[in-house]
């Protein structure tokens, strides 16, 4: 698979997604072997890029999924554990990977260059 560099393509659209992230609390009074963290809601930008396609007289369906800009973040992982009825138990996992995938859709034949959307969707993958 080839790696696509989104910065070389034109931007078709932008949108915002809200996610909850854990942030450590510095200087919190907690026992020595524990860490205190707060869950904070943040906005991330989702960008759709345009992929220019040269003139073509042949039908060339292009379907691909390419990982772009992977990064490692701590994530809250749900845990099946006995808890009181109105509570949920979760653990912090340091090995969750957020991978942005660029999906290239099939293209139809036209007599002029077309633009195919590349949509970057954050996905959490546990390793």
UniProtKB/Swiss-Prot annotation:
- Gene Ontology molecular function, alphabetical: pseudouridylate synthase activity; structural constituent of cuticle
As stated in the Swiss-Prot or TrEMBL entry, residues carrying the post-translational modification Pyrrolidone carboxylic acid are 1
- sequence repeat ranges are 31-39, 84-92
**Family matches, as InterPro entries:** Indigdn_synthA-like
| Keyword line | Cuticle, Pyrrolidone carboxylic acid, Repeat
Q: Which domain of life is it from?
A: Eukaryota
Which SUPFAM superfamilies does the record associate with it? Indigoidine synthase A-like
Q: Does the keyword Repeat apply?
A: yes
Would I find Zinc among this entry's keywords? no
Q: What is this protein called?
A: Cuticle protein 4
- Species name: Blaberus craniifer (Death's head cockroach)
Lineage, highest ranks first: Eukaryota, Metazoa, Ecdysozoa, Arthropoda, Hexapoda
């Amino acid at each position: 698979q080839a790696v696509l560099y989104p910065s070389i393509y034109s931007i078709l659209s932008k949108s915002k997604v809200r996610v909850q992230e854990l942030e450590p609390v510095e200087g919190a009074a907690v026992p020595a072997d524990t860490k205190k963290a707060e869950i904070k809601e943040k906005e991330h930008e989702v960008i759709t890029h345009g992929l220019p396609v040269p003139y073509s007289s042949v039908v060339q369906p292009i379907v691909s999924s390419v990982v772009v800009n992977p990064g490692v973040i701590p994530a809250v992982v749900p845990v099946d554990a006995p808890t009181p009825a109105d509570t949920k138990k979760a653990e912090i996992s340091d090995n969750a990977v957020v991978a942005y995938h660029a999906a290239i859709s099939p293209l139809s034949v036209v007599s002029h260059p077309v633009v195919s959307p590349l949509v970057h969707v954050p996905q959490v993958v546990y390793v």
